[in-house]
Amino acid sequence: MQFTHLVALALALATSEAAHQGFNYGNTKSDGSAKSQADFQAEFSTAKNLVGTSGFTSARLYTMIQGGTANTPISAIPAAITEQTSLLLGLWASGGNFANEIAALKAAIAQYGDDLAKLVVGISVGSEDLYRNSVDGVKANAGIGTNPDEIVSYINEVRSTIAGTKLSGAPIGHVDTWTAWVNGSNSAVIDACDWLGFDGYPYFQNTMANSISDAKALFDESVAKTQAVAKGKEVWITETGWPVSGKTENLAVANLANAKTYWDEVGCPLFGKTNTWWYILQDADPVTPNPSFGIVGSTLSTTPLFDLSCSASSSSSAAASSTAGPSASSVIGGKASGFTTAAANSAKPTFTVGKGPGGSYNGTGFWNSTSSARPSSSAISGSSSGSAAGSSGSSGSSGSGASGASGQSSSSTGSSSAPSTSNILSNAASGLSGSICGAVVAVCLALAAL
């Protein structure tokens, strides 16, 4: 009987090891109309049941605010609770509306409590604000940005807001392009973060050789550059993708075949190993943008536009070729969640109430804008840069770089002596060393002690 319980524990720990995989979700449709709870719920349900996949069960959000309101909590939250979709919450940090984002965050915590907390993977303060504030962002007409000091101030404000609440200790990060992360003037933001969100789009790196055959190398290089400045903090892949239709960017051709290749070569090695939010499930309802990144067309369907199945070889090869693999443990529930460097993780967050990435919103206007949010045609060299929190598409694009994240892996690797069975059981919720190996070792040690 005891053996059965230990095996069940090992399986539970192994299951919890898989990283979060999901999509970005805007709070408006491509025509600027606000999404309802039913809209979000339909998207989350579709993502969980996509043909050829194990299910995309996480959502990254760009804002806490429901489209068309001042500071009402976004209806993606009750939709996620119904569908049990994990959330990477987001607060829009450009344009001077942050007080309303904080108000919506407070209201959401008060209204949804534990139901929300158990789904939260982390909180993102801003999205590509530093890129939009950069010379490249201004040149690309990417929209209003924010300076690093202000982002740090906002991060501290969010920490104060969640202190003592159900979300207390939630890992807080910032999402930006790799070019923003490697810019030394933004280092204070890295210091303030628990994890770094990486947005990268080789399709937009139009000053480089960026054909689909170059895409994986460009992506890997930009992630590596981000890792190099991340100070040992985890890098979460918060946006990437390849368009299924649209204009050509230098050597990058937008079509289904190339979108499939990018999915296979870049996406498959990430899924289940590194927290990843793909761009995007659907961006063509009711208007198809140019370019369009949606893996389903104008009609929401569990049947994608191209084959999403990942072969064992595509999943393992790129994982092996990464500069640094995903950390063995995560800030949440002991899950592998991001890329880390070899640097020691000295301040690992201990947030344990939620699991999974979340839905996001992109836009070139703010949350009640009618603008479509698509990557800008004047992109300079790489990752997309949404300039406001509106539609389901991503906006202006920036460079090809690296970003770091600070949802660091645990520095603990387990005791040198065999733990007792009771200790193993009591520590199971924290993942024991945060890895599948830890779960297996735990069971072996427990069996040996019987």
UniProtKB/Swiss-Prot annotation:
> What's the protein called, per UniProt?
Probable glucan endo-1,3-beta-glucosidase eglC
Residue span(s) of the pro-peptide: 428-450
Spell out the molecular function terms from Gene Ontology. Answer: glucan endo-1,3-beta-D-glucosidase activity
Q: Where is the composition biased (Low complexity)?
A: 377-395, 405-420
Catalytic activity, per the record? Hydrolysis of (1->3)-beta-D-glucosidic linkages in (1->3)-beta-D-glucans
Q: Which Gene3D superfamilies match?
A: Glycosidases
What is the taxonomic lineage of the source species? Eukaryota, Fungi, Dikarya, Ascomycota, Pezizomycotina
Membrane topology per the entry is:
Lipid-anchor; GPI-anchor
What InterPro entries does its record include? Beta-glucan_modifiers, Glyco_hydro_17, Glycoside_hydrolase_SF
The record lists the organism as Aspergillus fumigatus (strain CBS 144.89 / FGSC A1163 / CEA10)
Q: Name one Pfam family in it.
A: Glyco_hydro_17
* Covalently attached lipid (GPI-anchor amidated asparagine), positions: 427
Q: Which GO terms describe its cellular component?
A: cell surface; extracellular region; fungal-type cell wall; plasma membrane; side of membrane
Q: What does this protein do?
A: Glucanases play a role in cell expansion during growth, in cell-cell fusion during mating, and in spore release during sporulation. This enzyme may be involved in beta-glucan degradation and also function biosynthetically as a transglycosylase.
GO BP: any one term = polysaccharide catabolic process
* The protein's Enzyme Commission number: 3.2.1.39
Q: Which family does it belong to?
A: Belongs to the glycosyl hydrolase 17 family.
Point out the signal peptide segment.
Answer: 1-18
Indicate the principal place this protein occupies in or around the cell.
membrane
Instruction: Spell out the post-translational modification annotation for this entry.
Output: The GPI-anchor is attached to the protein in the endoplasmic reticulum and serves to target the protein to the cell surface. There, the glucosamine-inositol phospholipid moiety is cleaved off and the GPI-modified mannoprotein is covalently attached via its lipidless GPI glycan remnant to the 1,6-beta-glucan of the outer cell wall layer.
The alphabetized UniProt keywords are:
Carbohydrate metabolism, Cell membrane, Cell wall, Cell wall biogenesis/degradation, Glycoprotein, GPI-anchor, Hydrolase, Lipoprotein, Membrane, Polysaccharide degradation, Secreted, Signal
